[in-house]
């Protein structure tokens, strides 16, 4: 009975992951851009499989992707402007801002959550955002 339950849970988990992956990969370029264009609040960072929530005492960080290709970054009371482009074939967003030019692979995206990868001084990590608008 335990093996049956374990098998069922494994199949359920794998099918759930496949559906989630397919739902993002089946979106058109216009649909992805429409989902990206909003205000996002940074809620977690993930490095080497370890997820760390952003503490409430840390000043909030936001990204605002505008439909005209402009990008606004807010870190506490500081604001930085930049630009962004989306590349549908590779599911990447390229940003140009005070940190230079960076390419971010979209890991997951829906109307409430957005996860993309980032790099800092040679370290690759994932950034998780929640819809803020």
Kindly give the residue locations of the regions a language model identified.
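Sec-dependent N-terminal signal peptides
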Residues: 4-13
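Lipid interaction determinants
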Residues: 16-81, 88-133
């Amino acid at each position: 009975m335990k093996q049956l339950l374990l098998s069922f849970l494994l199949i359920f988990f794998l099918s759930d992951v496949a559906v989630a992956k397919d739902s993002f990969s089946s979106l058109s370029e216009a649909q992805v851009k429409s989902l990206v264009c909003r205000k996002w609040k940074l809620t977690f960072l993930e490095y080497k499989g370890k997820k760390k929530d952003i503490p409430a005492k840390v000043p909030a960080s936001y990204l605002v992707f505008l439909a005209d290709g402009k990008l606004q970054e807010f870190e506490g009371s500081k604001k930085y402007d930049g630009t962004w482009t989306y590349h549908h074939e590779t599911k990447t967003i390229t940003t140009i801002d005070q940190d230079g030019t960076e390419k971010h692979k979209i890991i997951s995206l829906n109307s409430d959550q957005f996860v993309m990868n980032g790099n800092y001084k040679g370290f690759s990590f994932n950034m998780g955002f929640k819809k803020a608008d």
